[in-house]
């Protein structure tokens, strides 16, 4: 007989499958997607993002998480999984499906505008989309709660739980003095030769260097691959499918 935790795992696997499907579409968007397919791809990603949000914020799933959170017979690992998921659930329920899809579309639109602006070396092509995305992120930060000292705290917490603007300021302010000393020390040294940075290097040689380095560090090409993208990144669709991209610059 399935336990409540088994039901939790089953639900999370379904949600993860949708998330990994979105990741595949995003990977393709940044590697092989034809230019004229961008709008439809943005819609596809937004649709799946909305479905994933619905699955995750389903009240029945929320009730299951609350019951599990009160169980005392869970081991530490399972308890931690439930605690983190319940925290994410509370955050996710602050947003509507419509908002999630709107944000997804804005991110995709902003990315496409960035590609055009980068190619044309013209920030104006990117500015409007970026401003729209910043507005949406401000709304997101406000919806996440007003308890934070700084509005950006709510967004920082998504990537580094517990980090705040005050804490990050303390970290960076503490780095200023030693960094200034290091820079002064470097400036007193003889400048190294850097003409090699501006030479022309064969495309295939650059590509093969990446493959060589990946082999040297033990990267398993049966569980991943290297491709080219405008902005290099790493993504994963499962433990057996972790992909990375590189950029070639002659």
Could you tell me what each predicted segment is?
Residues 1-163:
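A well-structured
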